[in-house]
Structures are given as C-alpha cells and as structure tokens.
C-alpha cells in the first residue's frame, strides 16, 4: 500500500472563495424573498428562518474573509 502525503495547505485563494460564497448566499436570500409572495404562511415562516440563518452565515464568512486577508498580508504566519 502506497503512503499518501496530505496536500499542503493552500490558502492563497480563500478570500476569493469566501467572497464568492457570500455573493451566492446573498443571491439565494434574494431568490427566496421573491418566492415568498407565492408561499403559504407556513412556507414564508420557514423561508424567513432560513434567510436569518443565511444572514448569520454571511456575517461569519465576512469575519473569515477579514482573518484570511490579514493572514495573507502577514504571509500566512
């Protein structure tokens, strides 16, 4: 059995990946809000709850973007 070495940690594009994830999540929120007008009251509540979780995820991703950008500035030390 061959020994596999783990891939080195490549964080060079983490900021860009996180920014894409934030943008995609914002688009998902907007699409969900558009569908709310056609949803039942129960579905509206579920959509609102999911969008709240999405907003929380965006806040966490933005904090991670700041951390990754700072790490990039410091040479990932």
UniProtKB/Swiss-Prot annotation:
Top-level division of the source organism's lineage: Bacteria
Induction comment from the UniProt entry of this chain: Expressed only in the forespore compartment of sporulating cells.
Disulphides: none
InterPro entries xref list: SASP_thioredoxin-like (IPR017524)
Locations listed in the record: Spore core
GO BP term, example: sporulation resulting in formation of a cellular spore
Keywords: Sporulation
Family, as annotated: Belongs to the Tlp family.
HAMAP family: Tlp
Protein name, as recorded: Small, acid-soluble spore protein Tlp
Species per Swiss-Prot/TrEMBL record: Geobacillus sp. (strain WCH70)
Lineage: Bacteria, Bacillati, Bacillota, Bacilli, Bacillales
């Amino acid at each position: 059995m061959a020994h596999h070495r783990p891939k080195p940690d490549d964080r060079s594009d983490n900021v860009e990946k996180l920014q894409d994830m934030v943008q995609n999540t914002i688009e998902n929120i907007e699409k969900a809000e558009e569908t709310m007008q056609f949803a039942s009251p129960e579905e509206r509540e579920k959509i609102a709850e999911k969008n709240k979780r999405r907003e929380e995820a965006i806040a966490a991703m933005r904090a991670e973007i700041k951390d990754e950008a700072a790490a990039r500035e410091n040479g990932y030390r």
